[in-house]
Structure formats: structure tokens, C-alpha cells
Amino acid sequence: PCVIHTDDAHEYMVLVKRYNPNNTSDKETAFLVCNTKGEILLDYGKDTEKGELNMVYLMDKGANPSILCVYQKNGILTMHYTPLPLNKSALKGAGTAQDPYQLTCSNDFKLIDNNPSAYYEVANDIDFLSIPFEGPKRAFTGKLDGKGHTLSNLCLMGRGLLNEVKDSAKITNINIDKPILLLSEKHLEMAVGVLANSLQGGVDTAGVASYALLSNVHVANPVIKAAGYKEIIGTIVGYVALNTDVNTCSVTGADIVAPSAQVGGVIGKSQTYSQIHACLFTGNAEGRIVGGITSEVSGGEPVYDCRVDADLYSSNTIGGIVGHSGRSKIYNNIVYGTLNLSDTTKVGKVGGIIGHVDTDATGASTDILAENCLVALTSINVPEGKDVIAHRVIGFSSGDDYEYDWDNVDWSKPQSEWPRLYFAAEKNFKNNYVISDLAPVDATIQLTDTTTEGANIKAEDLSQTWLGEHGFLFGEEVTAPWVYGKSLTLWFEGELNTGVEDVVMPEGMKFDGTTIMAQGMLEVYNIQGILMARANGSINTVGWQSGIYIIKSATSTVKLLIP
């Protein structure tokens, strides 16, 4: 799409024989590109210096498409390349806040390189047709507003749609559906995400901070395959830092397989005064260090008001919300799903909220590290007979950390037998609870709200009043993002598939909240097209994950949101 020209007209390439209008006996071969508006965009015929047109190639498979025309004169071939698209600097708009550039098709994104500090809007839904795409290369410092439109079927290899995004850049209101991101050991980017590799604010020479923003960006059904890639992956952005705010973002239906990489369900890694809040991750993710929201926070980067409902897999470290925390504050989050540690060759670290919390060797810090978090996991699965530190709330923390008693080391013995001095148990956890159906992982730890195992609470006791008393704010905005219902959700979750909830069931089909009923044979598929159930007359949906399903009966097909 938009290879030849990035407007909304359809283009045609024509190879013709034509007469010279001034000499009807003089014929030439000509190559023309025209569009459905009756315009001739390109006209290559005989050239007085190069000779007759001999061959034409459309070279559209790489990152820099072009048209190659080959001329012949006196036995000498001359090649002429025309870069595509033909309107490399032509975007509607002026690039200002009042009149942003309009992005109308896939190749328009490449034109961002011409003015990366300008204002841009996505003018309509854009289908990238699963064709490998390489976006702009220069650092983007402008504003990009998706206006709620959807970019579908992105196919990215080795890097995100945008490369580096920095300074006071803002990216908002974009939906991305069914993107594919492929990575291998050959790819050298230190961090990669579907939308952007990195997003950073900054500080100018006078010490004035500039803030970057990522807000209301939603990625549905992403597939990320990264065999051999060992760096950082975040579904939306690989790495955020330096005064960056990430809020109201979601990743749903993810399928991420990156066994050697750090994997964050939403953001790969957060560093240097950034924050992530009011974000959602659902699906499954596999990596070396895995966090449902982010794989790592370096310290001073809060993660709060986030929800995860996922199956997470790792050979090293897993946290339902954060994989590895350098003592950042993680609060008012909830996690559903399962945590699964594979047959690790190192010390495995697993926590329902945080997999690993760095030790404060001084013991002087009083900063709260995990507060008002809820663990509603179905299971925490770790291999038997392996060196694993796992707890329902926090995996590894200071109570599991040690230094060697160097004064009493017997140097003739192996290191595994050297005496150890363990640090005191971490004191900076409070008000963390676990739905009591999940058994304690470590029976030696007290089940209180200040320990790594957390306190038990029954699901029926999670009233809106109790949650409000523990910092969960209810409303329909980023500062009060929670909705109380069958499960605790974020306010925007019901809007991710706008209109689906309002589908009117056709006559003869009913859904009472748990059972789908219709005359004759029924089939139900999930949003990925996988058959979930087939039955005559009725299908019970109790125990199904919340989400969008496709229902087929003998007379109709409809979409249904199962809460």
C-alpha cells in the first residue's frame, strides 16, 4: 500500500509504445505511472543522453523502495533509480499544533523523518497488510495523536514502528491490532517495542526537565517471537527513562516467546524518574526476566494502579507486576493468572507482585517498596529440587540475601560451603494481600501483610469499601481508574472493543451472563479464531477468561463481550 504515492488514489504502472507527436514515424517505449484521478505521476520515455528505455523494475521488497529504469544506447546500459514514494515531502497539513501533518497510509510514517519534531495525526485506520515494514529512523521529538484510529497487521523485524522517541515527545490515542515483531541474535537494538524502541524525556543545558508522554495506547493480539535475542523487549515500548509518564495503556491477548530476553508485558524497562500507571496486560509471555507490566525498574520509578491477567514463564526471574525492582515503589496493583518457573540452572526468583527486590545493605531505608497489592493468582509453579526463592508476593528480598563471613572462611573448602551472613528481612512492605485459595509457597514465612508471603483474604471479603480503604480509587479517569465488579478492572477495559458490548443479540439467541443459548448448533471462537466450544442448544462460559468471543449459530454470527 502507498508504495508509489501516499495519497488515497490508486496508482497504475503502464508500459506502452507511443508515437512522437511531432513525428508519427518515430516510436518509443515509455513507462508511465498514473492514478485514478487522471494524473500522470511519472513519464519515462526515450532519453537523449541515455537512449531507449530497455527494462523497468519495481523494487518494493526492501526498506527503501524505488523504480529502476534501464536505458540502452550504443550497447551501453545506464540505470536510473527513482526513490518511492514519489511524494516524499507531501503530507497534508502544516505540522503545527493547529494543523498537524495527516498520516493516511503506511508509508506516510516514513515521511516523519523529514520533520521529526512536528505534530502528526493518524487520519484513518491503516492496514499494513503484514508486509515487513521499516519506519522512520531519526529520533522523534514531536507529537503523534492517533485520534483513536487503528494500525493493523504491522510486521516488524528487529525494531519498532518508531525508533527513538525523546525529549518532550508525546504519543497518544493509538490502537494497534495484530502486530508481529520478530527478533533474533542478529538484531543489535538494546531495547525493542512494537510502537517504539525507546521513549525518554530529558533535561536541557539549564537543568530544565522535558517530559515525555505515552497515553491511551492499546495493543491487541501481538505476536512477538525472539529466539536468540538477549536484550530488552516491551510490547509497546522497549525502554522508558528520564521523566517519562506511561498511563492508560494496554496489551491484550499477547503471545510473547523470548526465552533469552528481559520481557515486560507493557514496557520492557523503566528507569530514571519514569512512572507507569493505569496499565493492563493479558495473554502469555516467556523470557529470562519477566514482569507482567515491566521487567525492571531501576529505583525511583513507581508502578501503580496496574492489572495483569496472564500466564508468565521464565527460566530466571518472574514478577506478576515487576520482574526486578531496584527499590522502586510498587503499589495498588492486582495480578491474576499463573507464574511458571522452568528448570532453571541459576537461582530462580518468583513473586506474585515482584520477582526480585534489591537489598539495601545499610538497612536504613524506610521507603515503602510494595503496598496495597493484591495477588489473585491461580498457581505459582516452580521446579522441584532446584535452587528457587519463591513467595506469593515478593520473590527475592534482603532476607534471602547474604554476604560471606570473610573472617571465618576456610579457603580450602568449596565456595558453596563458605559461611554466610544473611541480611535482615525486608521491613518495607505493607498491606499486601493474597486471595486465600493460593497456598503459601514458603511455610516458614508468616502470613501477614508485611511479609513476602502476604496476608490471606477471602475473595468474598474484597468489597468496594475494603478496596477503597486500601488505596484503590474508583472512577473513570487515570487518577481514579478502578471499576468494581465480578473482578477488579480498569475503567477503560470496557472501551477497548468499542461497540461490542452494545451488540443486540439476534432473535432466537440469548446470553444470561454465563450461558449462551440458541436453537440448533452453536460454535464459540476466541478473538484469535480458535474454537472454544461446540454444542447443540447452549454453551456454558463459566471459568472462561474475560474478553471478546465470536458466536456462530445456524442463522447468525455475532461478537460478545464476556466479562
Please report, for each region that a protein language model flagged, where it lies by residue.
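Aromatic (tryptophan-biased) beta-strands that constitute blades/sheets of beta-rich domains
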Residues: L42-K46, A533
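C-terminal outer-membrane/trafficking sorting elements
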Residues: E501-P563
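Eukaryotic scaffold repeat domains enriched in small/polar residues
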Residues: V3, D8-Y12, I67, M505-D512
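Repeated scaffold domains used in trafficking and secretory/extracellular systems
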Residues: P1-I4, K50-D60
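Surface-exposed repetitive/solenoidal architectures
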Residues: G45-D47, H80-N497
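Short coil turn/linker residues within repeat-based beta-strand modules
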Residues: K37-G38, G529
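Structural motif
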Residues: N22-L32, G75-P83
